[in-house]
Amino acid sequence: MEGPLSVFGDRSTGEAIRSQNVMAAASIANIVKSSLGPVGLDKMLVDDIGDVTITNDGATILKLLEVEHPAAKVLCELADLQDKEVGDGTTSVVIIAAELLKNADELVKQKIHPTSVISGYRLACKEAVRYINENLIINTDELGRDCLINAAKTSMSSKIIGINGDFFANMVVDAVLAVKYTDIRGQPRYPVNSVNILKAHGRSQIESMLINGYALNCVVGSQGMLKRIVNAKIACLDFSLQKTKMKLGVQVVITDPEKLDQIRQRESDITKERIQKILATGANVILTTGGIDDMCLKYFVEAGAMAVRRVLKRDLKRIAKASGASILSTLANLEGEETFEATMLGQAEEVVQERICDDELILIKNTKARTSASIILRGANDFMCDEMERSLHDALCVVKRVLESKSVVPGGGAVEAALSIYLENYATSMGSREQLAIAEFARSLLVIPNTLAVNAAQDSTDLVAKLRAFHNEAQVNPERKNLKWIGLDLVHGKPRDNKQAGVFEPTIVKVKSLKFATEAAITILRIDDLIKLHPESKDDKHGGYENAVHSGALDD
């Protein structure tokens, strides 16, 4: 009879692995916990080559961490997903997921099967989303532009630009509204990527500016070129305009020295013909990702066109989208002939090189296909400018979500407290085992107001108790249902009406973070076995060629 099956690796099962996973999740949450809320603290991260990042953004912190534990990796990916999908709420989603896991682990230790906990969590999440949509949303139509500004300010409150909240909130709202376009279905769309953010260190935050048009951090290729072109026809090229040289390995055998001159002449004529084909279509602004040599620049100067070299591929794509141009990586068509048609050109009202701040920039104004906007950020140093850019990205995403979903919910822990009370009452109406899981889900949500209060150096127990009392009153007594907007005022350390105070978050941020946190917690809860294979040794059996020779393994 054979012995038991051996697994080449470390195997841990049951309670041990579940506790391990919960601890890993809790340690990840503890890293970002102190950065939550308007008085959250920043993290300084130094990578292996010594690059420093100072940030308050949950997704950025977790992206820069080198995490080995598989369960902790799930939470890091969760923050990244929240950042890509919604753009904000990355810290809170990780904290909620870790708290859900911690409470689920307590239930499993009390001999409640993980499957019961999972089904309870799923039910609680579904009920929570339904309750938000039915009772807690505020329609943005009745609040207008103020609502957008307040949502942006709420997003920025914990960030470095929170001090100048009004200034940046107005800038963000104007930028998002500037890039609005209508898609095929007639729905308004707000592509946040169309807002180009440039950073220039020096001066103060308040001297940042919003520019109507696409700002390129480049200058014209030659001093002799025009600096301003009206009714621009833009060609976007993804190749270099330089004297064509023969490929390596090409050999030409010539018998007459004059032929050598002809070859050189032909090399320069090939590029000249390309430029003439481009200019013949009426193009007067040429943007290329490659270089343009002096010989080619001469033709553009003579034609009165503006040529810009070394444009970033990312910028070129955005300009092509905004102006209606096609990006060409070659002029060759399917027959192998080189052609350039006028339909490939984009259009803009004006392209001008201006000195803004301390740098020369090229501005592309009033593009034909879509409008575009650019923000130039000023700050004391590069770390500050980078963090300002991350903060602005979050705020832009928030404003976009509010405009697309047309609804917001009160911030400052109001939603979590309301859901906690509702789910506690809902749990008591359940007759099955899920009752305990739903009650734990309700308790887990209180981690958000709790953490907010702790980070603000307030008495969290007292504040959360008051908050729960208000929300309980709102749900029990229909006459006092306006109390459901009560959230925390962390500066003064007391509950307040966050609808009046203008603390708003997009509904989708709350709904998605609940769903994502629940799914992540369930994914980790389902794991009851971890098999970690031993890494294969790099050397072969004899430890390399030299050892093999010495040991005689190569002798026949």
UniProtKB/Swiss-Prot annotation:
GO biological process, one term: positive regulation of establishment of protein localization to telomere
GO cellular component term of the entry, any: heterochromatin
Chief location bin: cytoplasm
Keywords: Acetylation, ATP-binding, Chaperone, Cytoplasm, Cytoskeleton, Hydrolase, Magnesium, Metal-binding, Nucleotide-binding, Phosphoprotein
Catalytic activity annotation: ATP + H2O = ADP + phosphate + H(+)
Residues bearing the modification N-acetylmethionine: 1
Residues with the Phosphoserine modification: 6, 551
Claim: Repressor is one of the keywords in the record: no
Residues binding Mg(2+): 88
PTM annotation (N6-acetyllysine): residues: 199, 400, 494
EC class name: hydrolase
GO molecular function, one term: ATP hydrolysis activity
Protein location: Cytoplasm, Cytosol; Cytoplasm, Cytoskeleton, Microtubule organizing center, Centrosome
Residues that, per the record, bind ADP: 37, 89-92, 158-159, 412, 505
Residues annotated for ATP binding in this entry: 37, 89-91
InterPro entries from the UniProt entry: Chap_CCT_alpha (IPR012715), Chaperone_TCP-1 (IPR017998), Chaperonin_TCP-1_CS (IPR002194), Cpn60/GroEL/TCP-1 (IPR002423), GroEL-like_apical_dom_sf (IPR027409), GROEL-like_equatorial_sf (IPR027413), TCP-1-like_intermed_sf (IPR027410), TCP-1_chaperonin (IPR053374)
Modified residues (Phosphotyrosine): 181
Domain of life, per lineage: Eukaryota
Ranges annotated as spanning the membrane: none
Enzyme Commission designation: 3.6.1.-
Subunit annotation: Component of the chaperonin-containing T-complex (TRiC), a hexadecamer composed of two identical back-to-back stacked rings enclosing a protein folding chamber. Each ring is made up of eight different subunits: TCP1/CCT1, CCT2, CCT3, CCT4, CCT5, CCT6A/CCT6, CCT7, CCT8. Interacts with PACRG. Interacts with GBA1. Interacts with DLEC1.
Biological role stated in the UniProt entry: Component of the chaperonin-containing T-complex (TRiC), a molecular chaperone complex that assists the folding of actin, tubulin and other proteins upon ATP hydrolysis. The TRiC complex mediates the folding of WRAP53/TCAB1, thereby regulating telomere maintenance. As part of the TRiC complex may play a role in the assembly of BBSome, a complex involved in ciliogenesis regulating transports vesicles to the cilia.
Protein family: Belongs to the TCP-1 chaperonin family.
Name this protein carries in UniProt: T-complex protein 1 subunit alpha
Organism: Rattus norvegicus (Rat)
